[in-house]
């Protein structure tokens, strides 16, 4: 787009913009989207960063909008516990949480219930209820060969999640006609067009 307007920009400049501004946009997006009451779908995806496997914990609501993401080096109960606690702090308690049959997610959920969080929440592990989030992982698995460090992978994924979230929200509301990423970012940042 910039080249079409006569502006010559190196690809490393665009990469630096993504690394710097994607975090800001992600946190603004999270501030504006703080409601999810009915059901959450949670899963983890494997992402290779510099030849080593890392784990991307993701949670979406019943409409498919991303609630939160968290990139971790380990896939264990402690990481799942911290992610569930973080979700509870931001969104409160849903009616149901749908996960796969991963032992770490189940034990973390039981541990949080014993502490007093999620007392009324139902934990479902039915295989086909989690299809929505499994399909939602695709873009991150496709781009895994480009990630060179945990920090850059995290900020790149946050930027991708923000743009996908804006697109999904407009698609769900039926306002995709005339959709513009730049207009949505201006609205997100409170800048008048």
Cite the ranges covered by each PLM segment.
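Residue-level recognition of single "structural anchor" positions
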Residues: 1-193
